[in-house]
Amino acid sequence: MLPDPEDPESKKATRRAGNLIICFLFIFFLFVTFIVPTLRHLLS
């Protein structure tokens, strides 16, 4: 059963999931940006 798109609760849950995904991608981007050069420096 798909939730009713007009249901404000399902809309809120969808937006919250989107925010979590955006936050995860942002943290992942920062992790890659800072950790990868550090590891490369340590391993070289």
UniProtKB/Swiss-Prot annotation:
User: Where is the secretion signal located?
Assistant: none
> Which controlled-vocabulary keywords does the entry list?
Host cell membrane, Host membrane, Membrane, Signal-anchor, Transmembrane, Transmembrane helix, Virion
For this record, an example GO cellular component is:
virion membrane
Which residue ranges does UniProt annotate as crossing the membrane?
17-37
Membrane topology annotation: Single-pass type II membrane protein
What is the annotated localization of this protein?
A: Virion membrane; Host cell membrane
Lineage, top-rank taxon, reads Viruses
Outline which residue ranges sit on the Virion surface face.
38-44
The record places the following residue ranges in the Intravirion compartment, namely 1-16
The entry's function note states: Inhibits TNF-alpha signaling and seems to block apoptosis in host infected cells.
| Sequence similarity | Belongs to the rubulavirus small hydrophobic protein family.
Protein name, entry field:
Small hydrophobic protein
Q: Source species, please? A: Parainfluenza virus 5 (strain W3)
Q: What is the lineage of its organism?
A: Viruses, Riboviria, Orthornavirae, Negarnaviricota, Haploviricotina
